[in-house]
A protein has these predicted regions:
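Extracytoplasmic "Venus flytrap"
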Residues: 39-60, 64, 73-87, 104-108, ...
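C-terminal motif of bacterial Sec signal peptides marking the signal peptidase cleavage site
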Residues: 19-23
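Short beta-strand elements in bilobed, periplasmic/extracellular small-molecule ligand-binding domains
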Residues: 63-79, 165-168, 189-205
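Flexible loop/hinge segments that line or gate small-molecule binding clefts
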Residues: 109-147, 165, 253-264
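Bacterial N-terminal signal peptides that target proteins for export
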Residues: 2-11
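Hydrophobic alpha-helical
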Residues: 91-94, 99-119, 185, 202-257
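Hinge/cleft segment of the Venus flytrap/periplasmic-binding protein
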Residues: 13, 25, 34, 169, ...
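Hydrophobic alpha-helical segments within soluble ligand-binding/sensing domains
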Residues: 31, 86, 141-166, 207-211, ...
Length: 308
């Protein structure tokens, strides 16, 4: 073998060895020579949910990111949960030819069509927090929302002794995670005829609307259930102890209200872990050409003042 060929073979062997030792898939060059560009579009930066997902992504596995050549950018719309603005951000990232898009799923037609365009151009799609039903091959990372709703229903039965008139407040129509939670809640209480669930009302993720519904529903309901975090967070900020309007208040993620006693209990989602697993699963794809699973569920648990 000529000296030139020996040199080329040695370089190739060294590159493959570096990839293996660095945790990257053969064929993905070491960090600095080729970058997997990831754009995360979060619908909102808040203090108790999306911010924690963002922190999980930003703070997770710097060694993994470096070894696998991963560059992650986090964006959000100017207005919280503004779908047209998120669609525009998606289009910009498609034009920029990023490798991976991490998004919250929803059922808006233009939003889904834009994601399908990205998918058709070879961009990997990861849904976090909320999945998209019947979407082409993609990854979902987040809560098993049906089971979370069922857990909420079971705890509703426990705290009310199976008898309550319940106001049900959700975020906004068109989000499968909230619909699945509602389904789980309904299934959990269906054999308890003395638990009456009212029609679902939507606060549109707005604290003022939450408070308006809170007082309006107190006329007919003795219990209020929030299917996502806005309601509980709002109640937590308004009341430092239990308010006399309701006998029981249950929700998601608002742990400050649980600590103060303003809320009976919450379903606590592992939001930071959602963010961490985004990074870990992208690394899996870089190394192995596939994710560990099509669906990666994070844990949930029932939190009260007693077990906080």
């Amino acid at each position: 073998m000529s000296e030139k060929k020996k040199s080329a073979a040695g370089i190739l062997t060294l590159l493959v060895l570096c990839c293996v030792l660095g945790g990257c898939k053969a064929g993905i060059p070491v960090a600095g020579t080729d970058i997997t560009r990831v754009t995360v579009i979060l619908p909102h930066f808040d203090d108790g949910y999306w911010m924690l997902i963002g922190e999980g992504i930003e703070q997770s596995g710097e060694k993994i990111k470096k070894n696998c050549g991963m560059d992650i950018k986090i964006l959000k719309p100017q207005l919280n949960y503004n779908i047209p603005q998120m669609v525009e951000l998606l289009k910009q990232q498609i034009a920029a030819k990023v490798d991976v898009l991490v998004v919250q799923g929803n059922e808006d037609e233009e939003y889904i069509d834009t994601l399908k365009e990205a998918w058709s151009e070879g961009i990997q799609i990861i849904c976090v927090d909320t999945d998209i039903k019947n979407f082409p091959e993609h990854l979902y990372i987040g809560t098993d929302n049906y089971e979370a709703g069922k857990m909420l229903g079971e705890e509703l039965i426990n705290v009310t002794d199976g008898e309550a008139n319940v106001a049900v407040i959700s975020g906004e129509p068109g989000f499968s995670n909230l619909e699945e939670r509602l389904e789980g809640l309904q299934d959990a209480v269906k054999d308890y005829p003395k638990i009456h669930l009212g029609d679902v009302q939507y606060d549109n993720y707005d604290g003022l609307t939450v408070m308006k519904m809170y007082y309006q529903n107190a006329k007919d309901a003795d219990t209020i259930v929030f299917l996502e975090g806005t309601g509980g967070v709002t109640i937590s900020s308004q009341f430092r102890q239990r308010d006399a309007q309701y006998e029981h208040i249950l929700g998601f993620d608002a742990f400050y209200g649980v600590i103060s006693g303003a809320i009976d209990g919450i379903i606590k989602q592992d939001t930071r872990r959602m963010g961490e697993q985004v990074v870990e699963e992208i690394a899996n794809y870089i190394r192995n050409g596939e994710y560990s699973s099509e669906t990666v569920y994070t844990t949930t648990h029932w939190m009260t003042a007693e077990n906080y």
